[in-house]
A protein has these predicted regions:
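Short C-terminal tail/terminal secondary-structure segment
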Residues: 4, 17, 25-26, 128, ...
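Active-site loop-to-helix junction immediately N-terminal to the catalytic Tyr of the SDR YXXXK motif
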Residues: 29, 134, 178-187, 198
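The beta1-alpha1 cofactor-binding region of Rossmann-like NAD(H)/NADP(H)-dependent oxidoreductases
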Residues: 71, 92-105, 136, 248-249
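Substrate-binding pocket helix/loop in short-chain dehydrogenase/reductase
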Residues: 129-131, 135-143, 235
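Active-site helix of classical SDR
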Residues: 154, 188, 196
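Short, flexible catalytic-loop segment of classical short-chain dehydrogenase/reductase
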Residues: 193, 214-225
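Short, small/polar-rich loop/turn modules that mediate ligand/substrate recognition or access, typified
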Residues: 204, 209, 265-267
Length: 279
């Protein structure tokens, strides 16, 4: 299975993707598993974040979506959330700025009075063949958005989280099997996995759980926006299932980790990789 060669300008947009990703718009059915919860989802405009937002809303949660500047995608995601009868707050801005991370949480508390679920999902990457090709500012930005923002968001959110709340970090199969062309991204995803392990222990006494999801190759706007067209064409073909995953195929895992069903699940990393193992 392959996609046609295509290229977008970062950070990418859903509308230009062929084929269009499946976020569960027409398939996800909720059953009240997150009824009454308030969730913050970064990178919530598209890709995995959109699929999680749709699933959370259909499970009964209100949602704040943090995103950079992809307003069209964000508005479409918000429409799906509101169609489910839930509140959706949109907060654009750059998570590389610690002050903006704090502002995201402040706006969630203003809207909902608390944070029950924090999903740190926003990510940045670029493909480079050599370490000498990586600009210093690209290294810094990748770490700031992918890893440091997770720290700043969590630090700001914890005082507003009650026992039973959940923190979920989006890591990657790359934390175990790092492709050399994504060096800064690989580093951040390993860092998220380790941060989650520390948070699970640090926050246990507060009744707050921390877990991560390790996706394999998932068909999101980040792919045509950050990879050469020939890599886009074969994206996902290397895993045992022979295809990229769809965002909708990850959403149920994020729902489970946010739900009370996962009350004893903390410090875990769940792989959704199309058969590629993580250790």
């Amino acid at each position: 299975m392959s996609q046609p060669r295509q290229q977008q300008v970062p950070p990418g947009a859903t509308a230009g993707m062929v084929p269009r990703p499946d976020h569960g718009e027409h398939s996800y059915r909720g059953s009240g598993r997150l009824a009454g919860k308030a969730a913050v989802i970064t990178g919530g405009d598209s890709g995995i974040g959109r699929a999680v937002a749709i699933a959370y809303a259909r499970e009964g949660a209100d949602v704040l979506l943090s995103y950079l500047n992809e307003h069209e995608d964000a508005q479409e995601t918000a429409r799906w959330v509101r169609d489910a009868g839930r509140t959706c707050v949109l907060v654009p801005g750059d998570l590389a700025d610690p002050a903006h991370c704090r502002s995201v949480i402040d706006k969630a508390v203003e809207a909902f009075g608390r944070v029950d679920v924090l999903v740190s999902n926003a990510a940045y990457q670029m493909t480079r063949d050599s370490i000498t090709d990586i600009p210093d500012e690209e290294w810094d930005r990748t770490l700031a958005i992918n890893l440091s923002a997770f720290f700043h968001l969590t630090k700001a959110a914890v005082p507003h989280m009650r026992p039973g709340s959940a923190i979920i970090g989006s890591t990657s199969v790359n934390s175990d099997s790092p492709p050399p062309q994504l060096l800064p991204y690989d580093v951040t995803k390993a860092g998220i996995a380790n941060m989650v392990g520390s948070l699970a222990q640090m926050l246990a006494s507060k009744g707050i759980r921390a877990n991560s999801v390790a996706p394999g190759p998932i068909w999101t706007p980040l792919i045509p926006a950050t990879m050469p067209p020939e890599q886009v064409e074969s994206f996902g073909s290397e895993v045992p299932l022979g295809r990229p995953g769809q965002p909708a195929e990850l959403a149920p895992v994020y729902v489970m980790l946010a739900s009370d069903e996962a009350a004893y699940v903390s410090g875990a990393r769940i792989a959704v990789t199309g058969g590629q193992p993580i250790l």
